[in-house]
Design a protein with these regions (language model features):
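Ligand-binding loop in jelly-roll beta-barrel domains
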Residues: 82-107
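A short, N-terminal "cap"/entry segment at the start of jelly-roll beta-barrel domains
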Residues: 1-33
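Glycine- and acidic-residue-biased ligand/ion/polar-headgroup-sensing regions
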Residues: 53-67, 74
């Protein structure tokens, strides 16, 4: 069993590479091809159309963002399959999102 991590005391916010300037992350898990992060979107956040080689799940913890004309508020959930295009995203006031990428499976 892994040790419990106190996210706000033991993990620092880092610049989120490949995201717009001012976006930060806390990496909760990065093992065996799977990754989980807390993503802090700044006010005015915008990310264009993109895809990933693995599936992605998003759960809004705080704030909101807009995707394809629908606003995802606190408690909202999204799932995208591997190679599925998604975006653009926009957050007027910023958001805190739990993002989970599943392990890469070459046969997907």
């Amino acid at each position: 069993m892994k040790d419990l991590i106190n996210l706000f005391d033991q993990l620092n916010w880092e610049n989120a590479d490949n995201y717009p300037e001012g976006t930060f992350k806390k990496t909760l898990r990065d093992e065996d091809g799977a990754k989980t992060i807390l993503l802090k979107m700044p006010a005015g956040f915008r990310m264009e159309l993109h895809s990933h080689i693995t599936s992605e799940q998003n759960f809004v913890l705080k704030g909101a963002f807009t995707y394809q004309g629908f606003t995802y508020h606190e408690g909202s959930y999204q799932h995208f399959n591997a190679h599925e295009d998604h975006g653009p995203y926009y957050s007027k006031d910023g958001a805190l999102v739990l993002v989970i990428w599943d392990p890469y499976k070459p046969d997907e």
